[in-house]
């Protein structure tokens, strides 16, 4: 047991170190894609452009990484412009690395089959822009106040993944201290929480340097948003699929006591758990289960969501699972999920939650059912067409066999010739 725990701890440390190195390497590889253009070498030589000998790389990403790590062009110049030739095959040099003093020194001209990338080296490091996020203090949770943690979004080729693991049993006792404060926090407002998840629509690759996202602009007065750290995934991705907005009403108007400890649904990872207690909302996404206090990172996951809401004063939980939620796209584009929280004073039973989800799923259900009559009518038509073709083929085969048999029977039948036939035949022979 000891060796198994030690081995898993070592394996987790190795994975974290590997991802940290990949993250550190990817932060220096911010680039701007330029399709079907190439540097005008003749006019750029007099303006200070420098370059190395072309090399062979299997993919464009390898060429970009090679440019990011190359800092010895003409002695001490760092590569900031690269060209990848997609027309080269059979391990021929296809990656060209250059150093451009400025953008005006490297004029471009159109060229089919060549992809150019401008490496942005003066972009500020993302780790310095990410503020240290702490949970709100006890005095900031008074009525009329709210705390909010805003993390700036990187402007180019960055994918944000979800936080790894947040547990109520770890966060609440450490940050808020006593059960008296929990009672004061839960009894401040008996309102319902409405969660709006906005997903950013995918943009083209040329317009990916954009302004920062607007985050959480519909916050209530008595809401505490629990921030979570943001991990940066692999760079150089192209675009993100647009996601529809989803309304997740939580119409639970109860007052749990301070001694209740809500627990997350412990299913096999990966699991996404949304635990809602008025007036606070915690969104946590668990991918893998780490050993001790280490947080494990995962690559991709098919998410299952569980909604939990307190139902009585003793802290018992009602679990309403729902399986249809917008697919979270990880490390495939510029995706960031800003969360907006709004409070309302509408009280209803927990059964309204299931009704709202059924209503939300009704529109895609109707659209999918609209295609059923076409399939039902299309299948018999194809069936009759196949039967008709088969019948026509059999009929033509029978006709051909009849004609062939008639010809064969006539050729084998012995004819009776008359004297006139012999006379005519003799005349033709004489001629």
Swiss-Prot record:
Extracellular side: 27-385
MANSC domain sequence ranges: 33-117
Record flagged with keyword Membrane: yes
One cellular component term from this protein's GO annotations in UniProt: membrane
Bias-annotated ranges (Polar residues): 250-265
Stretches assigned to the Cytoplasmic side: 409-431
Primary location class: membrane
Ranges where the record places region Disordered: 236-279, 352-372
Carbohydrate-modified residues: 31, 222, 251, 327, 352
Keyword vocabulary terms for this entry: Glycoprotein, Membrane, Signal, Transmembrane, Transmembrane helix
Subcellular location: Membrane
Keyword Membrane assigned: yes
Transmembrane portions of the chain: 386-408
Topology in the lipid bilayer: Single-pass type I membrane protein
Superkingdom of origin organism: Eukaryota
Residue ranges, compositional bias (Low complexity): 266-279
Signal peptide residue numbers: 1-26
Name of the molecule in the record: MANSC domain-containing protein 1
Gene source species: Macaca fascicularis (Crab-eating macaque)
